[in-house]
């Protein structure tokens, strides 16, 4: 089989230079402040509404279909404003 379908939370796929993680958050659940030094980050919201804070001075409210990308050296934290599912792709530099 050429394709693999995954729809559960957690690590979905990984390779030498990337990881794709599906995150599932309940309403009000927080993503603690952190960074991904040495990687680029791409977040794609599938369901719900996610508020992302970058470096404590930039706020983005993401809804299904929205994609945000940023360098992993930036500090990031977030809050699910409702039940939310999103894919996070980490790409090594």
Features from the language model and the residues they span:
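A short, N-terminal "cap"/entry segment at the start of jelly-roll beta-barrel domains
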Residues: 1-21, 32
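Ligand-binding loop in jelly-roll beta-barrel domains
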Residues: 72-93
């Amino acid at each position: 089989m050429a394709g693999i379908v995954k729809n559960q939370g957690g690590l979905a796929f990984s390779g030498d230079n990337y990881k794709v993680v599906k995150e599932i958050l309940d309403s009000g659940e927080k993503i603690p402040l952190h960074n991904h030094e040495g990687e680029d980050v791409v977040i794609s919201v599938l369901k719900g509404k996610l508020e992302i804070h970058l470096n404590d001075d930039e706020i983005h409210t993401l809804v299904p279909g929205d994609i945000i990308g940023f360098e992993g050296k930036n500090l990031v934290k977030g809050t699910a404003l409702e039940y939310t599912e999103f894919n996070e792709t980490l790409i090594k530099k």
